[in-house]
Amino acid sequence: MSSDYQLLDFGDHEKIEMFGGTVVRRETPSAIGELGLPRQESELSFRLGRHLSQGKASSEGKSSHGKGSWTGQASATWRTKICDLTFSLRQTPTGQVGVFPEQAHNWNWIAELPDRMQGMKALNLFAYTGGTTMALAGKGVEVVHVDAAKSVVSWARENASLSGFADAPIRWIVEDVMLSLIHI
């Protein structure tokens, strides 16, 4: 599976990642321990090329617990490929960029499932920007994609289009998951 994501380092409640040539340093409360790279190397890897910083590592020097401003030199949006799925990424106020790369193992697992999934149906709740939806669509599964945020569902549709699933049998629902379960 093709991927241009790389986890460069994590610790001190932050992680440093590369998404499609853009290095992102962002606050991550679960990244405990110390950064694996010496601080100088970590700073150097961050300074190379396009980069973004959020929260703790921001130029304001204060921790924002995931709700900070972004600083750095990068496009407002950029793309990355994980498991042959293309994601449009952008900076959000919550410190997210539009993909959870740790889900790649699940997407690979789906891709390796037998082709007899063709025509099956799946319900993807809290579906965010569509990684699992696209992985299932790639196996010919009819997917109901549910998320409460209209902007996130639009973002997922954009990702599906970028990944070649614009015409896949995906039903896009903007609704609170609990309400959606009552209606489905």
Label the model's feature ranges:
Residues 111-178:
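Conserved SAM/SAH cofactor-binding pocket of Class I
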Residues 100-104, 175-179:
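Conserved phosphate-coordination/catalytic loops
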Residues 3-17, 24-101, 108:
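Non-catalytic substrate-recognition/targeting regions of SAM-dependent transferases
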Residues 1-11, 15-19, 84-87, 128, ...:
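Aromatic-residue detector
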Residues 182-184:
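Conserved small/polar residues in nucleotide/adenosyl-binding loops
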